[in-house]
Amino acid sequence: MTRKLNFMGAINEALDQAMEKDENVILLGEDIAGGRDVGHLEEQNEDAWGGVFGVTKGLGPKHGLDRVIDTPLSEMGYMGASVGMAATGLRPVPELMFNDFIGFAFDSLLGQASKMRYMFGGKATIPMTVRTCHGAGASAAAQHSGSYYGIIGSIPGIKVVVPATAYDAKGLLLASIEDNNTVVYFEDKTLYGLKGEVPEEYYTIEIGKANVVREGSDLTIVTIGKMLYVALEVAETLEKDGVSVEVIDLRTVAPWDEETVLESVKKTHRLIVIDEANPHNNVATDIASVVGQKAFDYLDGPIRTICAPNTPTPFAVSLEALYLPNAEKVLTEAAELIDDLKVKA
C-alpha cells in the first residue's frame, strides 16, 4: 500500500524499518537523538530535534540510546568509530550534518573504509552507510551548500547514492544499509519537503540502476538529484515545439548506469548532462567522457554539460538562483543541439 510521504519522512521510515529488521543497524550523529532538552537525554524526550533537519526525530524514543547515539561535535571521531563498528559486525549509519564537513572525516573514507575489503582479500567488509545533506538553493552560503558526491564517487571501494524522489529516498537508503560495502548517501536538503507516493512496506531499489523518468527520441537529458525537476520542466517546454526529450535520473553516481545512458544516446543522438556540482572533475564530465568514447558515432552534436560555476556557492538569494543550473540555461544548450528548435531560449 502506498501513500503520500515527503522526502524526509521517507528517509525516517527507511531508518526505522532497517532498525526493526536488523538489530545491528546503529545510528550516530550530532544531535540526532537530542538537540533539544539535552539535560534529559536519557528520557529521549519526544520533542528532541532528531538532527539539524529533524530527519531522525522519534527514532531515539523508539529504539533507545544504545542504537541512536548522540556524538560529540567531531566528525573525525564518530566516523572513525563507525568504521570500527562496521569492521566488527555492526551496520552503522552515521549522519554527517553537511557534506561540506566531509574533510574532517576524509581519512575514515579514503584511508580506511574504501580500502579494507581490498587489503584483506575480500574477507573484510565495511557495511557503513554515511548519510549527509548537500545542495544549493536554501541560501545556506558557501560552507553549507556544496555538492561533493563527485569527489567521493571518485574513490574506489565506495558507492554513492543521490536520490531525487521520496520513493527513491526510501528504497535506495534501505538498499544502502543492506549493502556490504560503504555507501555515502546524499540527501538534498531542498527536497526534504517534497512529497511523493511511497509504499508502507520495506523495499529496496538496486544501487547502480538509473531511472528513465520520461521516454523520448530527440534528446537525452541525464540528471543528478534535484536537477531531475529542471530536466522535466525543459522536457515539457520542448514537447510543445515537437521535440521529444528522454529524461534519465541517475540515482547513483558511483557506480553510474552506463548501459542505460548509452542506450538512450544511441536512440536520441544528443546528450545534455545537468549536474549542480562545480564544472571540473565532476560526474557530468565523467559521463561525457564515457559517452564520447563509447557512443561517439551515434552523436549528432557535441555533448553538453550544464553545471554550477567554478566558484563557491553565493549566499545572496538572487546570486544563488543564477548560480544553479536552470531551465533557461538548459533550453539555450538544447536550442544549439536541435536545429529546428522553436523555443525562445
Model-found features: residue ranges?
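Thiamine diphosphate
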Residues: 1-182, 189-190, 194-345
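Non-catalytic, usually N-terminal nucleic-acid engagement modules in DNA/RNA processing proteins
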Residues: 185
